[in-house]
Design a protein with these regions (language model features):
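Hydrophobic, helix-prone linear segments
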Residues: 1-5, 37, 44-46
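A short, Lys/Arg-rich alpha-helix, primarily the initiator
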Residues: 1-16, 64-88
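Tyrosine-centered aromatic motifs in long, intrinsically disordered, low-complexity repeat arrays
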Residues: 6-9, 22, 50, 57-59, ...
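Short, structured motif recognition centered on aromatic/hydrophobic residues
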Residues: 10, 61, 82, 106, ...
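Short alpha-helical DNA-recognition segment
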Residues: 18-36, 88-107
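DNA major-groove recognition helix of helix-turn-helix/homeodomain DNA-binding modules
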Residues: 46-63, 117-134
């Protein structure tokens, strides 16, 4: 999945729940420009803002691979998930190389010391072979 597909999924979920951008902006504190950046996917954006957006529309991210699943309600959940998955399967160096990043970035994600962009988030989810879904809580 790429950023455009992810953004279209977010926009579609918001529209299907009949929630206005104004309400999302009011509930999250995100500006109209930030919401447009998320929904139009012209540029990358922070997953921190995505989790605010999802909270405002009453949703979360579900990750699925066969019988394995994980629910992400915030960026901290993502760091924990990466640590758990990487520890079982792949070294930090191998993951960084696979997603075109570096060990420092992986360390910061796992210790919740770094803002994660949507493109990196999607690459990591794909690297572990998981399918992403936006689900109502």
């Amino acid at each position: 999945m790429n950023r455009i597909e992810f953004s279209n999924m977010l926009k579609g979920k918001r529209a299907s729940l009949d929630i206005s951008k104004y309400k999302v902006s009011k509930d999250t504190g995100l500006t109209a420009l930030q919401l447009n950046r998320i929904e139009d996917a012209a540029n990358s954006y922070s997953m921190g803002n995505i989790f605010k957006y999802l909270g405002a529309i009453g949703c979360h991210i579900g990750l699925y691979k066969g019988k394995q699943s994980c629910v992400l309600n915030g960026i901290n959940d993502f760091g924990i998930w990466v640590t758990k998955k990487r520890g079982q399967k792949i070294s930090m160096y191998a993951l960084a190389k696979q997603i075109g990043s570096n060990i420092t970035t992986i360390t910061r994600i796992e210790t919740n010391q770094s803002a994660v962009g949507v493109d990196l988030f999607l690459k990591i989810v794909e690297a572990f072979g998981y399918e992403l879904k936006i689900e109502s809580v």
